[in-house]
Amino acid sequence: MGNSMKSTPAPAERPLPNPEGLDSDFLAVLSDYPSPDISPPIFRRGEKLRVISDEGGWWKAISLSTGRESYIPGICVARVYHGWLFEGLGRDKAEELLQLPDTKVGSFMIRESETKKGFYSLSVRHRQVKHYRIFRLPNNWYYISPRLTFQCLEDLVNHYSEVADGLCCVLTTPCLTQSTAAPAVRASSSPVTLRQKTVDWRRVSRLQEDPEGTENPLGVDESLFSYGLRESIASYLSLTSEDNTSFDRKKKSISLMYGGSKRKSSFFSSPPYFED
């Protein structure tokens, strides 16, 4: 028999690692891949990917929004657990994801702190992205403010999802929740038909000057309006002619109240929160 050569078998796909016994919910794309300078990206920043296999530094994954399947290097993604616990991204990437279009105020993530290893940080979208350090006690309980501790991160998230309690705002939705939301379908509305010349607004000023004027001062076909609507128009015109002094007094009182509230707040110290 002649010599024969065996083809080298393809490397078997390794099972996914299980940190703390949890499978990641999805991968979050941190930057467009491939780079737009090289070719049109297959996966874009902010996309959520479902893992197919771990190829040793590379992931085989499928996009949850486009359905495209391909490989992506591990440095371009972060693993996400519980929908809000991000593993493998820093402060800058967290801010980029939280500032993506359609990200709502209160969107948040928890990530490993860059400045304190073994600790976590809570990043929240507000007017700007705010970062709060999460401390861990020797008994493995967590806290942001020392006066309030939690047995696990999930309890911490649940609490601050109900009340801000010193944070910049209430936690609303995990980061990237909107990235796979189905686009809203606008219900088709029936066409609106307008009748010509319902109200001659050029004659309104004359009505204010001469309330005892003609029988139909607005030039309106009264059959087109109910009695209540005609009364509403008349009430509106009478209100617009009133003096605005009451509004000025109200505005001044509001400004005084606001000034008083600012002075009052100095007597109450907010709970100590440590920004990361």
UniProtKB/Swiss-Prot annotation:
UniProt keyword list: Cytoplasm, Endosome, Lipoprotein, Myristate, Phosphoprotein, SH2 domain, SH3 domain
A Pfam family the protein falls into: SH2
Expression across tissues: Expressed in lung and fetal brain. Weakly expressed in heart, adult brain, placenta, liver, skeletal muscle, kidney and pancreas.
Species the sequence originates in: Homo sapiens (Human)
GO MF term list: epidermal growth factor receptor binding; phosphotyrosine residue binding
Domains: entry comment: The C-terminal domain is essential for the homodimerization and the interaction with CBL. While the interaction with CBL is apparently mediated via the hydrophobic region of this domain, the highly charged region is apparently required for the homodimerization.
GO biological process: regulation of MAPK cascade; signal transduction
Protein name: Src-like-adapter
Gene3D superfamilies according to UniProt: SH2 domain, SH3 Domains
Modified residues (Phosphoserine): S253
Record function comment: Adapter protein, which negatively regulates T-cell receptor (TCR) signaling. Inhibits T-cell antigen-receptor induced activation of nuclear factor of activated T-cells. Involved in the negative regulation of positive selection and mitosis of T-cells. May act by linking signaling proteins such as ZAP70 with CBL, leading to a CBL dependent degradation of signaling proteins.
